[in-house]
Amino acid sequence: MTILFSVDIVEALYDYTATIDEEFDFQTGDVIAVTATPDDGWWSGELLDEERQEEGRHVFPSNFVRLF
């Protein structure tokens, strides 16, 4: 059985430096796969640069990105 689900892909508009352990740093132009979009504006996702991914860091501010 194959399960398919939709993942939004966003591009970073600005650099962001994490301020808590759950967040991750990213740079302008980075691409992020979004896994959850709660209404508080702090989305969950994964940086699509395996060399810079950090386990346990998945939260980022939605106002720093745009949908592709």
Language-model features, listed with the residues they occupy:
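Src homology 3 (SH3)-mediated interaction modules
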Residues: 1-68
